[in-house]
C-alpha cells in the first residue's frame, strides 16, 4: 500500500528579516514535543547555513544538514543573485526536488522560504510558486514593526488570490524592548500586541498568534498538525 506523502507547512514572511526561522523552529519543536517526526526543508539560503542549522537542531537532526538546505550561499542577497556573485548556478529543479527525501521520512514537513512570499528564489520561481507546487498551507510571519497590519493583510490577500491556504499568521516581535514602558504606544511590544489585536479582528477566520521577542516558549498552542493538513476549498 502506498504511503501518502507527509503534510506540511510553508513558513513565509511579509518581508525579509521577519522572524521566520524562530517561528519555524518553534513550530518544529512543538511538533516534535507531540511525538511526531518533523522534517525541515529550506530550499535555498543566502548569508550562510545558520537558519538551516537552527531548523535541523529543532527537529532533532533528522537526515543531514545538506538535506535541510541543499543550496546555500554566503552572500546575503537573493539566492539566484548570490549564486551568480559566487560563480555558481542555482539549480531550479533542485528547489522542488529537494523536498523529496523528506516526504517519506517524516510525519510532517516544515518548509522555510527565503524572504517574503513574493521574493524571488530563482530567475523564474518566487516563494509563492514553490508553496503552490508543494501544496502546503502557508504560515505568514511578520516582524511586528509599525505597519505590520497592512503588510499582513496585503500578503494574506495576495496568497488567497494565488490559491494558497493560509494556515496561520504569527507576529514575531523582532525588535527588543528598551527602557520605554509598556504604556508607551510606540514601544515594540505595544506595536506588536496592538497589531495582533487588529489582525484578529480583521482576520476572524485565521489563527493570529504573537511571539514576543526571544519568547519562543510563549507561542500559543495551536494544532499545527491539523493546520498542516488543510487543503483549499473547491472553487465553484
Residue ranges and their predicted role:
Residues 11-12:
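Hydrophobic anchor at the beta1->P-loop junction of P-loop NTPases
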Residues 3-8, 22-89, 93, 98-104:
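N-terminal phosphate/diphosphate-binding loop that engages ATP/GTP or pyrophosphate donors
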Residues 2-3, 157-236:
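C-terminal lobe/tail of nucleotide-utilizing enzymes
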Residues 38, 109, 138, 166-167, ...:
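Hydrophobic anchor at the start of a short beta-strand
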Residues 95, 99-123:
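Switch II (G3) loop of P-loop NTPases
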Residues 18-19:
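Conserved glycine(s) of the Walker
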Residues 40-42, 139-142, 167-173:
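Short internal beta-strands
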Residues 122-145:
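Inter-motif core of Ras-like GTPase G domains
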